[in-house]
Amino acid sequence: MRAQSKDFNDVITQIKEGGNKIGMTTLSKEALQLASMFSFNMSDDIKSLLDGMTVLKITKNKTGTTATFFDNSVKAFDEAGYTSIDVSSYVDRNTVRVFGKRRWLSIREAHIITTTDRGTNISIFGKFKIRTIRRVLKNNDLRKLF
């Protein structure tokens, strides 16, 4: 994020101090509100998958930004027919392809995607747009995470 990098860094600091979780118990109301505005410049297919998920943590390092989603993210990928995520199939540094039963899906701006038993990680190179994760947080009861 260019314009709000200071605010973003403040959020990251609070996340780290709060045990790397975004939630009512670990972030101030202002930081939670700011974090809820982050979204990714991705295809509509992926946005629709992400809309039903709860953001568990956001971390930032030299190579990009990683958002970790709650367990139901894995279920959402399964239901959409994306049975495996091939993190080695870079088209370029801004595109990763998710392999599904039906087709390859290109995810713009994604650097790497991994699924674990704790959730789905999406690492982002560069661009952030302030838009849609607001819906993700609003549609989920964050208290169920704690």
Where are these regions (language model features)?
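Early exported N-terminus immediately downstream of N-terminal targeting peptides
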Residues: D7-S73
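C-terminal partner/receptor-binding element of secreted or periplasmic proteins
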Residues: G126-F146
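Short connector loops at helix/strand junctions that flank enzyme active sites
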Residues: L50-D51, V91-R93, I107
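Boundary at the C-terminal end of the N-terminal hydrophobic targeting segment
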Residues: A3-S5
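Short Gly/Thr-rich strand-loop-strand
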Residues: A76-R102
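A short, solvent-exposed beta-edge/loop patch
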Residues: F99-I130
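Surface-exposed flexible segments
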Residues: T65-A80, I124-F125, R135-K138
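Localized chelating/binding microdomains
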Residues: A35-F38, R108, I122-S123, R134-V136
